[in-house]
Amino acid sequence: MVCSPITSRLALPTLVALCAGLWPSAPSAHPHIFVDSGLRLVVEGGVVTAVEVTWLYDELYSLILMEDYGLDPDFDLVLTEEEVAQTLGFDLNWSHGFEGGLVMHRGEAELTLGAPSPVSLELVGEGQVRTVHRRAVTDPGGSGTVEAQIYDPEFYVAFEMIGEMIVEGATCTPELIRADIDAAYAGLEAAMDAIGGAVAAEDNFPAVGDLFADRVVFECAG
């Protein structure tokens, strides 16, 4: 059995009870899951109307997902239509304050995002799970730059925005601005000290995910 400390934040497999005691305490273990993210913005009439979000799960977690959902039992790295139909959208039943991690702004205004709908599920490379979901976007428009971040506030899942950044319907250049990791860990240490240290953080991990968040800025012509 492969064990991992799983949370229901992404409605993912629940092996935590079976694996208790095999993992370090929460502060030293965070994050548990690593996801490379990409975006496809849909622009109509100068405003963003939808966004497709790609999540590529790390190799270990992909293995856990495949075992838990019974995916690819023949090990050919290709999911059948039945496997996709039964599993598509598994990571969209969000809970515990997690709302998909995506935050978008135009200038100072935060854009409103609709509920997610699943688009695709596949295996890539040597068996990594990749999913895509789509969300409607309410964008007031204007000349402000569009920016996006993806992060888990509790830093259980570590997102990196290193996937493809595509804009459909406008000529835009995406710029990836990486998080300052040294500053982020300094902020994490300060936040943990403020609540009484690592022991207190085991059941009350501080919401520091934004400190570790990459940012993508979309500079669009016209």
Question: At which residue positions do the language-model features occur?
Answer:
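N-terminal secretory signal peptides that target proteins for export/translocation
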Residues: 1-8
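Bacterial N-terminal signal peptides
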Residues: 11-22
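N-terminal signal peptide c-region/cleavage motif recognized by signal peptidases
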Residues: 24-26
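Early extracytoplasmic/domain-onset interaction patches
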Residues: 31-63
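Short solvent-exposed loop/turn micro-motifs enriched in small/polar/acidic residues
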Residues: 32-34, 95-96, 114, 211
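Structured domain cores in non-transmembrane regions
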Residues: 61-141
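Mature, soluble, non-transmembrane domains
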Residues: 107-222
